[in-house]
Amino acid sequence: MRKIVISALLFGCAVLAGAVSHAAQDALADDLTPISRQDWNAVRAAHLLERAGFGGTPDDVARFTAMGPAAAVKALVDFSGAAQADANRHLLPFDESGIHDPGLEPFPTGRPAATDQAKATGEALGIKVKPTGNRRMQPVVDKFFYWLRASRLETDRLAYWWANRMLTTAAPLQEKMALFWHGHFANNEEKVRDYRKMKRQLELFQAKGTGNFRDLLIGAAQDPAMLAFLDAGVNVKGAPNENFAREIMELFTMGVASNGVANYSETDIREAARAFTGWNYQDLSFKENADKHDGAVKKFLGQSGNFDGVQVIDLILGQPATAEFIAAKIYRYLVREDVSDAVRKQLGAELRNNRYELAPLLKKILLSRDFYSAPSMATHIKSPVELAVSTYKKLDLKEVPGVPDFNDATGALGQRLFHPPTVAGWAQGKSRITPGLLLERGNFARDLLFPNINFLPPDRYNQDETIRIVSSKIDQGQDVSTATKPEGKGMGGGGEAMQSMSTAMADRDEDFNTRYGSFRGWQLATQKVKPIPRRPAQLDLAGLVRSQKLLNATQVVDYLLARFIPLAVENADRARLVDFLKNELGTDDVVQAQSYLEEPLRLLLHLIMSLPEYQLG
């Protein structure tokens, strides 16, 4: 079976690239008029659920088919109200571990900054330096590493919480657009170093992600996670830092150029940077330091005035290029990679004419004939998060499995929530389908269907070899200096006595031990951060087959293909799947094989999920 899977995955690179690059044209392409009720069917309803959410079960597809296109799109876009709130009563707030304390603020830029502060003031991170004795600043160092480790682990829990919302929400477009904005306003926890700020930013995307773009943009620009990520604190009067202004203009609003014409100049960036001087944050709040703001006249995008940051944002929103840039990026996310100039201009006008309200734009896109055209359907290569959540959805799971680990699995595929690689977000499209990544996608399916009995929870088992070695040596009773001595540095022979003497001296004289602090930080973090539940996927494929009254291998294969694949597979692939199932069952009679049906079905589904067509949505 492994040989079949690998061959399919490697061949799939060419198949997927061809499917995305050479999708057939039809009369619906680039037509933004609404699709009619007469043209509505189950295939298009399933397509809508895939793109505006994370897919659906056959029951979901049947319900949206019966609604018709206008009602179906309205239900997805207009998700606020009492009925929707009632449908989402099961969605609980994030269950905090309670790991933060006020002494952590403001968190130092690094370990040296923490110990320098402790040395200068006698206190840092809410911890006082010991008056006398060995390693007087060790508790400060321990606290520093504790917060780094605890915030990372709590962020992983936050990602699980969000993935469960994606899976079970009655408002899938809310979470789908939150995922879009997370990649658009891309900040990562490694730089922000505070899960609370990442959580606040996610809540902003969930609350305003389908509302008014101006409100969302100002909220994101003044968000503590964004300000921390883009080093806003160093942007002050007399020494403006252009990084913040450049990212807002280049990545978040206008784009560098439209049709080869620059949308702004380097002078515009410098002047915008002056307008943003004084913007900073304090803990979880936006803070505007008036004494650090440049209040002089600025010249920006052809306008002159004493502009502040919000006024600069409004000037940016007044540019036609901004509405077109945002509308086109949303189109590429929901529809397809290539957007024609005509469509870009129409959608930009739609957004601008509605004063940057996103809901009318989303309705226009999702109702358009273009959205259901051949170039748009089954041509989107699913992101790792889309792949994982849509897989859980099609399996009708009620919770994200703990095995395999959701964060590690999606990270191996190239997308770990709250950890985008750059401020530009994650790679899109064909970059997701290298041979190595396709093999990882097959491995994800395998680990989901056949959980690894040797699985070690990454939030409990430290994967840093150095920390594991230190932990082992401490458990053996070694003193701190000996336990933290780098491996392979022993002198041998008589040098051991000299090393013992130097170790003893170090134990007496050092102010702190960084390696011990790193170990102790992990130890404290795992004590305080709540563990991620590790229940594997609760599957009953045999029960599913029985409920559908499927009698032979061909019926089983056709049912599973229809449920999991958005387009028809090659006849030869279908025939191989049927033959595979017959061989595993030892018969074509599914009823006769009831007592041992589950494992062959899981093997079959692994093959289906490893097909190149399964990567498309």
Regions picked out by a protein language model, each given a short descriptive name:
Residues M1-I4:
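Positively charged n-region of N-terminal signal peptides that target proteins for export
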Residues A27, I127-W147, S151, T155-A163, ...:
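Active-site substrate-binding loop specific to GH73 endo-beta-N-acetylglucosaminidase modules
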Residues G53, T65-G68, L179, A220-Q222, ...:
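A mature extracytoplasmic/lumenal domain signature
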